[in-house]
A protein has these predicted regions:
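Auxiliary Fe-S-binding modules of radical SAM enzymes
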Residues: 1-22, 28-31, 75, 198, ...
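N-terminal [4Fe-4S]-dependent radical SAM core
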Residues: 2-51, 55-66
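Conserved Radical SAM active-site core
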Residues: 29-31, 36-41, 59-156, 161-180, ...
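Hydrophobic faces of well-ordered beta-strands that scaffold small-molecule active sites
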Residues: 41-43, 88, 120-122, 143-145, ...
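Short, solvent-exposed polar/charged micro-motifs at secondary-structure junctions
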Residues: 41-44, 132-133, 262-267
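Short, small-residue-rich loop/turn micro-motifs
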Residues: 47-49, 147-149, 217-219
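Short beta->alpha linker loops
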Residues: 49, 69, 126-127, 280-283
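Short, flexible active-site loops
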Residues: 180-189, 219-227
């Protein structure tokens, strides 16, 4: 049984947010457990619509997001929710080029950042030089960027004519910018198999400014072309070990997108002492305790 031990306070650019330390008899090492949920909702600027409809998603995940399709409505939402939630993820469906159409929300996000306590995490899709310009003007607290390390995956899963080099160039643009950002890698994205993930890690190793590396795992989702895909679990675990060997572990987070039945991935992240896990199982929290770790709860997105 785990009990709330005491409340600490974590500070971020957008204001003061609470962190709960669970069952902490001695300060050994903290592992963060993230519960974004209602305190950190996801917003789609395109509603349920997506022009791209990648094979792993097919716009299904947009159906669970709050549809806010105009800057004015976004500001209204922020005013109404200020003080009630920690912040929100701003995302949406992609254009045929693989971009989330966020530019028209530049002033709205800037206003929210400057006038409310809400933390804003923006999920961009692929970005170029012109996107960096408006994103720096927008000035969100954080950018979440999905890194694709295989051109075959870009073509066959996402369905764009881009290449892995375009994604690596986008990382370089983010690293040279004034923006806080966290790369995300979807393990098993190529129809359940590991393909370009190792190259993505090697690229990230060369960067200087990223906050966290968020590792997630493909969920074979009903209603998508990948609903019957079988994950190469052994290959995914090997990749996670490679990531943990090559990236600072206190920057690696196991993100929310992953099959909940894949318990081994949670146990590995605890054993290897990564920074945190989003919504861990009770068995995983118990393992943290057995490993002498303190579990610190954050009701927000795992990039923070």
């Amino acid at each position: 049984v785990f009990y709330l031990f005491y409340h600490a306070t974590a500070f971020h650019d957008g204001g003061r947010k609470s962190t709960t330390i669970i069952n902490s008899p001695a300060f050994t090492k903290i592992m963060y457990i993230y519960y974004p949920g209602a305190k950190f909702p996801s917003i789609s600027v395109t509603g349920p619509h997506c022009a791209l409809r990648c094979k792993h998603c097919n716009a299904k995940y947009l159906q669970h997001m709050i549809p806010i399709t105009t800057p004015e409505k976004l500001v209204e939402f922020a005013k109404e929710q200020d003080g009630k939630i920690s912040g929100f993820l701003l995302s949406g469906g992609s254009t045929l080029e693989g971009k989330v159409p966020l530019k028209r929300f530049t002033r709205a996000v800037r206003w929210i950042v400057e006038n409310t306590s809400l933390i804003v995490n923006v999920h961009t899709g692929i970005i170029d030089e012109i996107d960096i310009e408006y994103l720096e003007e927008m000035h969100p607290h954080h950018i979440s960027f999905d890194v694709i390390g295989s051109t075959s995956t870009v073509h066959e899963v996402l369905g764009t004519k881009r290449s892995k080099e375009d994604y690596f160039h986008a990382l370089e643009l983010l690293d040279r910018s004034t923006l806080n950002y966290s790369p995300h890698i979807i393990a098993g994205l190529h129809f359940g198999k590991v393909l370009g993930e190792y190259d993505a890690i090697d690229k990230i190793k060369s960067l200087n400014r990223y906050s966290n590396l968020v590792l997630i795992v493909l969920i074979p989702t009903k209603g998508t072309p990948m609903e019957n895909v079988k994950l190469d679990k052994e290959g995914i675990l090997e990749f996670f070990n490679y990531a943990l060997d090559n990236i600072e572990r206190d920057k690696i987070v196991l993100g929310c997108m992953r099959p909940r039945s894949f318990h081994e991935i949670e146990y590995l992240c605890v054993k290897r002492r990564c920074k945190g896990i989003v919504i861990p199982s009770l068995k995983t929290i118990k393992l943290m305790h057995e490993e002498g770790l303190d579990a610190a709860r954050k009701d927000m997105c795992c990039v923070f």
